């Protein structure tokens, strides 16, 4: 995945005078699975529409295989889109839905038969080719939509929240299948999602967006473990964010009257324009007087695979902790963490 198949350079978009994309720039590598992740209204779907050709940017460049993509009409772009609604034809059976694009192109019948059945087998629907769409489950409909897109042999597949309509269990299954399929066929996938867990589990890289801007680009591990600002840290899972700490010097921070080790460097000396993040799963609950701070349990919530425990220290700071152990309200404990689990970042600057 060395070559950039797609490049966006300072792309902007306005609707009725409202700026919805504010200078978006990122590259997509050939064969990469990249997710545009963010809350509703952040601009991620607008980017997908601009890449697909149904909308044009107000300014900026988009290069596909080093050529200007913007003037190329939709039907000439080597992309296919899978919509949240799947946009299947209810009056056609599975085979004819998958074959639709090839039929419109007047492809020879023997080629249609071969290519359609190959894709139907690829998505695990062999034996369903004569079924009507309304006879299929949600997951099967999604497989038809995927086969219909892939039969056209696009170089890039665009996915607009493709699993949003599925129930939780089926969504997990389809996430695994879609990732496996992408790895098997090796083409570039660009997916829009508001689901953090989905993006973390499926993507090679994630573009995190908010209010028309890119907050961070990175691998799932980078996004989760090294968020670039407090907004990303809060959006990607729960976080304990210390906003009043001080970066004393390389590998040393201070808050609530105590000095702690960290692995961060290059934030200067006695620097207060920083935030400190410690993830809930990285905090260890110990017996009183065995940790950095003594604390009292003030809330517990069972989350299925772990307990979410909220404790409060004598400094009145509250900490969210994820643990497999159950604790009682008002129980006295102490908390501790490892230096590698402390993450320092610059405070966000309001422009």
Swiss-Prot record:
Quaternary structure note: The complex is composed of two ATP-binding proteins (PotA), two transmembrane proteins (PotB and PotC) and a solute-binding protein (PotD).
InterPro entries: AAA+_ATPase, ABC_SmlMolc_Importer, ABC_transporter-like_ATP-bd, ABC_transporter-like_CS, Mo/tungstate-bd_C_term_dom, P-loop_NTPase, PotA_ATP-bd, Transp-assoc_OB_typ2
Originating gene: potA
Catalytic activity, EC: 7.6.2.11
Gene3D superfamilies, per database record: 2.40.50.100, P-loop containing nucleotide triphosphate hydrolases
A cellular-component GO term for this protein: ATP-binding cassette (ABC) transporter complex
Annotated organism of origin: Mycoplasma capricolum subsp. capricolum (strain California kid / ATCC 27343 / NCTC 10154)
Protein name per its UniProtKB record: Spermidine/putrescine import ATP-binding protein PotA
Sample GO molecular function, one term: ATP binding
Positions with a binding annotation for ATP: 38-45
Keywords: ATP-binding, Cell membrane, Membrane, Nucleotide-binding, Translocase, Transport
Pfam family, one: ABC_tran
Catalysed reactions, as listed in the record: ATP + H2O + polyamine-[polyamine-binding protein]Side 1 = ADP + phosphate + polyamineSide 2 + [polyamine-binding protein]Side 1
Entry keyword annotation includes Nucleotide-binding: yes
Entry keyword annotation includes Transport: yes
PANTHER family named in the record: SPERMIDINE/PUTRESCINE IMPORT ATP-BINDING PROTEIN POTA, SPERMIDINE_PUTRESCINE IMPORT ATP-BINDING PROTEIN POTA
